[in-house]
Amino acid sequence: MLGSLSKDAVAKSLVSRLGKKNVMQVPRVVKVCLNMGIGISAADSKVMDSCTRDLAMISAQKPVVTRARKSIAGFKIRKGFPIGCMVTLRGKRMYEFLDRLINIALPRERDFRGLSTSQLDGHGNISFGIKEHISFLEVDYDKIDKVRGLDVVIVTTATNDADAKALLLELGFPFMN
């Protein structure tokens, strides 16, 4: 499993690669946030239920419904209107999700060439989108009403992009050259 690998082998190899003095200074993954925006079709409760069901199957955790903070007439939404769902993964579930993401979902993604270094935010975190949530094996293609995308944010304790990229490369994330 990726969690035990992260704490032992990855940390020891990062100590020498990053020039740190001990294992506690090495960056680690803190949490993974998954967000699925639904858009204007959120008025239909069936769409909302299917999105929360799909995200729950992907993350193995019940998602929270996100609601609009203020009304925007141009988008035809009112305050409190459901606009998506999100889930935050930590600990064992986070490492299980990262393992499935790296080894199953990203290779199945259509036209995926690797993550870009421009997706790092300058503070050691990375955000990217997955175009089709059916890349995950947990989602049954016959039971979905529409193929949707989702956003993935990986938060690390790294203070810069170089340390974060080194951590993600050790975990097995594919980066473009």
UniProtKB/Swiss-Prot annotation:
<comment type="subunit">
    <text>Part of the 50S ribosomal subunit; part of the 5S rRNA/L5/L18/L25 subcomplex. Contacts the 5S rRNA and the P site tRNA. Forms a bridge to the 30S subunit in the 70S ribosome.</text>
</comment>
<keyword id="KW-0694">RNA-binding</keyword>
<dbReference type="Pfam" id="PF00281">
    <property type="entry name" value="Ribosomal_L5"/>
</dbReference>
<dbReference type="InterPro" id="IPR020930">
    <property type="entry name" value="Ribosomal_uL5_bac-type"/>
</dbReference>
<dbReference type="InterPro" id="IPR002132">
    <property type="entry name" value="Ribosomal_uL5"/>
</dbReference>
<dbReference type="GO" id="GO:0005840">
    <property type="term" value="C:ribosome"/>
</dbReference>
<comment type="function">
    <text>This is one of the proteins that bind and probably mediate the attachment of the 5S RNA into the large ribosomal subunit, where it forms part of the central protuberance. In the 70S ribosome it contacts protein S13 of the 30S subunit (bridge B1b), connecting the 2 subunits; this bridge is implicated in subunit movement. Contacts the P site tRNA; the 5S rRNA and some of its associated proteins might help stabilize positioning of ribosome-bound tRNAs.</text>
</comment>
<keyword id="KW-0820">tRNA-binding</keyword>
<keyword id="KW-0689">Ribosomal protein</keyword>
<comment type="similarity">
    <text>Belongs to the universal ribosomal protein uL5 family.</text>
</comment>
<dbReference type="GO" id="GO:0006412">
    <property type="term" value="P:translation"/>
</dbReference>
<dbReference type="GO" id="GO:0019843">
    <property type="term" value="F:rRNA binding"/>
</dbReference>
<dbReference type="GO" id="GO:0003735">
    <property type="term" value="F:structural constituent of ribosome"/>
</dbReference>
<dbReference type="GO" id="GO:1990904">
    <property type="term" value="C:ribonucleoprotein complex"/>
</dbReference>
<keyword id="KW-0699">rRNA-binding</keyword>
<dbReference type="InterPro" id="IPR031310">
    <property type="entry name" value="Ribosomal_uL5_N"/>
</dbReference>
<dbReference type="InterPro" id="IPR031309">
    <property type="entry name" value="Ribosomal_uL5_C"/>
</dbReference>
<dbReference type="InterPro" id="IPR022803">
    <property type="entry name" value="Ribosomal_uL5_dom_sf"/>
</dbReference>
<protein>
    <recommendedName>
        <fullName>Large ribosomal subunit protein uL5</fullName>
    </recommendedName>
</protein>
<dbReference type="Pfam" id="PF00673">
    <property type="entry name" value="Ribosomal_L5_C"/>
</dbReference>
<dbReference type="GO" id="GO:0000049">
    <property type="term" value="F:tRNA binding"/>
</dbReference>
<keyword id="KW-0687">Ribonucleoprotein</keyword>
